[in-house]
């Protein structure tokens, strides 16, 4: 079964936060939709555009796996574990809040927005030691493993029974792609950019797709596309 989460139907950040254009696939902050609380262990998928010299001041998190993916621009990260660094376009960051962590995320640019996805994943156990990783992955055609409970093939470790793959497909090399699935697992596809059909369902940039009880995804590209595919219990 396929259920589309259209980009234009997502929740939006509060208009009083003038420096933020945020779009929420699931209930978050002032946005509440009883039909969109979570999907499996996915609790938050936020697409944020943050204005120059603004961002989120130091604030707490606990018992959450937090993934950030920078699409354009730069974000400056600082946390209570002693990390103080910048993430640039194409970089990923994973942080286990665990027993408790404070962090801040600020756009240091005086000119350019930062465009990012932030994704919260419920961990399989509470109270773990906080941790932090960041890095880039190969910008190649096809699938790249980003998160894995075994941290295999260079992926970041995730404290949950799930994996995350980034798919980058071009019309020149992969106009049609078949991705086998396990019907006992649940999957979420988030289209970062492009346009494609998934089992004859049309998706545009920023659309999401909840996938259950399916054996295969038949991907037909309409434009060069990038998507995140979450493999969930």
UniProtKB/Swiss-Prot annotation:
Cofactor note (record): Binds 1 divalent metal cation.
GO MF terms held by the record: metal ion binding; quercetin 2,3-dioxygenase activity
EC number(s) given by UniProt: 1.13.11.24
Reactions it catalyzes: quercetin + O2 = 2-(3,4-dihydroxybenzoyloxy)-4,6-dihydroxybenzoate + CO
Keywords: Dioxygenase, Metal-binding, Oxidoreductase
Keyword Nucleus: no
First-tier enzyme category under EC: oxidoreductase
Function noted in UniProt: Putative quercetin 2,3-dioxygenase.
PANTHER family per UniProt: QUERCETIN 2,3-DIOXYGENASE
Name of this protein: Putative quercetin 2,3-dioxygenase PM1685
Native source species: Pasteurella multocida (strain Pm70)
Lineage: Bacteria, Pseudomonadati, Pseudomonadota, Gammaproteobacteria, Pasteurellales
């Amino acid at each position: 079964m396929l259920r589309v989460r259209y980009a234009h139907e997502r929740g939006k950040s509060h208009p009083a936060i003038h420096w933020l254009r945020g779009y929420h696939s699931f209930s978050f902050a002032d946005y509440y939709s009883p039909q969109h609380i979570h999907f499996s262990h996915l609790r938050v998928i936020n697409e944020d555009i943050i204005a120059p010299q603004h961002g989120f001041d130091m604030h707490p998190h606990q018992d959450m796996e937090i993934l950030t993916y920078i699409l354009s621009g730069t974000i400056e990260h600082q946390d209570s574990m002693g990390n103080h660094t910048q993430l640039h376009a194409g970089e990923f960051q994973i942080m286990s809040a665990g027993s408790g962590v404070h962090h801040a995320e600020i756009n240091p640019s005086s000119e350019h927005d930062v465009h990012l996805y932030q994704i919260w994943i419920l961990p399989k156990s509470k109270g773990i030691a906080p941790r932090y990783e960041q890095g880039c992955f190969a910008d190649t055609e096809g699938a790249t493993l980003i998160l894995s409970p075994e941290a295999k093939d260079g992926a970041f470790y995730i404290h949950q029974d799930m994996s995350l793959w980034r798919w980058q497909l071009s019309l020149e090399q992969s106009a049609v792609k078949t991705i086998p699935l396990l019907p006992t697992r649940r999957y979420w596809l988030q289209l970062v950019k492009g346009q494609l059909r998934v089992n004859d369902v049309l998706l545009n940039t920023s659309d999401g797709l909840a996938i259950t009880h399916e054996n295969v995804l038949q991907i037909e590209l309409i434009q060069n596309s990038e998507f995140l595919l979450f493999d969930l219990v």
